């Protein structure tokens, strides 16, 4: 296979690995506070204002227990 055909087959996103983890902007359903949390949190994440649990660890991705407003890149 010649070089041009090889390079056409693969885009830059195929060659450079991208992280699978994301940061999330979430809103507390109790008090309406918005905060940014890590999608793969390894500890329980609580709201800074009211203390409600927003995310629980599951061994991989965190279980999000509130409303996700935005996924940050």
UniProtKB/Swiss-Prot annotation:
Q: Which residues does Zn(2+) bind? A: 28, 31, 47, 50
InterPro entries listed in its UniProt record:
Ribosomal_eS27, Ribosomal_eS27_Zn-bd_dom_sf, Ribosomal_zn-bd
The Gene Ontology biological process annotation of the record reads:
translation
Q: Which UniProt keywords apply?
A: Metal-binding, Ribonucleoprotein, Ribosomal protein, Zinc, Zinc-finger
State the free-text cofactor note. Binds 1 zinc ion per subunit.
**One of the record's GO cellular component terms:** ribonucleoprotein complex
ZnF (C4-type) ranges = 28-50
Whether Ribonucleoprotein counts among this entry's keywords is yes
Keyword Ribonucleoprotein among record annotations: yes
Q: Which Gene3D superfamilies match?
A: Zn-binding ribosomal proteins
One example GO MF annotation = zinc ion binding
Give the required cofactors.
Answer: Zn(2+)
Note the PANTHER family from the entry.
40S RIBOSOMAL PROTEIN S27
Similarity comment text for this entry: Belongs to the eukaryotic ribosomal protein eS27 family.
Complexes and interactors: Part of the 30S ribosomal subunit.
Spell out the protein name for this chain.
Small ribosomal subunit protein eS27
- Native species of this protein? Methanopyrus kandleri (strain AV19 / DSM 6324 / JCM 9639 / NBRC 100938)
What gene is this protein translated from?
rps27e
